[in-house]
């Protein structure tokens, strides 16, 4: 992976080693983003025409290009590690050894089975070792991996593994609660169900007290 930050390369290698990387083909380095958008727009035009839509209508004529731009620059931007957020780690001079929790992180992802929306929130906690991470970086990491075709179980484990790798500690926990529009808007059309996934590492898995403290934070209990 050329021209990646040290953190992005480290994270990618950790996910590959654990079998948690999103299924990806070898990168097509010869294609820049503008070429990708042009090709996607062309294929989207064909799909819309096969649906018998009239692309000469002023409401539809730019839709293939809008979709292509949205895919490459927005909802699937996390497929490109060049977009991995800049990470700020601070030496733990304060010797913080209690749980740090970031709750209700908004995430919007895309179901890789049907390419429809996953809409949810994540709660992430860790117990610092040698470093602490800028709090907004946790949100950005969640959003980066959400900006891919995903399954929720993998997304949860990816966030856990990435933070363990960057922070140099296994003491990380992640919980995601999300509504899947492949369930809500099609198939069974269940508009009220939600899916919760949790991934625990280190003390969050081995210590009942630490685990319960995290789960209380997830449930917003004092």
Curated annotation (Swiss-Prot):
Pfam family, one: GTP_cyclohydroI
Family (UniProt): Belongs to the GTP cyclohydrolase I family.
E.C. code: 3.5.4.16
One annotated GO biological process: tetrahydrobiopterin biosynthetic process
UniProt-recorded name of the protein: GTP cyclohydrolase 1
Amino-acid positions noted as binding Zn(2+) in the UniProt annotation, renumbered to this chain: 111, 114, 182
Keyword annotations of the record: GTP-binding, Hydrolase, Metal-binding, Nucleotide-binding, One-carbon metabolism, Zinc
Binding partners and assembly: Toroid-shaped homodecamer, composed of two pentamers of five dimers.
SUPFAM superfamilies: Tetrahydrobiopterin biosynthesis enzymes-like
Gene name, Swiss-Prot/TrEMBL: folE
InterPro entries (alphabetical): GTP-CH-I_C/QueF, GTP-CH-I_N, GTP_CycHdrlase_I, GTP_CycHdrlase_I_CS, GTP_CycHdrlase_I_dom
MF annotations from Gene Ontology: GTP binding; GTP cyclohydrolase I activity; zinc ion binding
Catalytic activity entry: GTP + H2O = 7,8-dihydroneopterin 3'-triphosphate + formate + H(+)
This protein's GO CC annotations: cytoplasm
Organism: Salmonella choleraesuis (strain SC-B67)
Lineage summary: Bacteria, Pseudomonadati, Pseudomonadota, Gammaproteobacteria, Enterobacterales
Pathway: Cofactor biosynthesis; 7,8-dihydroneopterin triphosphate biosynthesis; 7,8-dihydroneopterin triphosphate from GTP: step 1/1
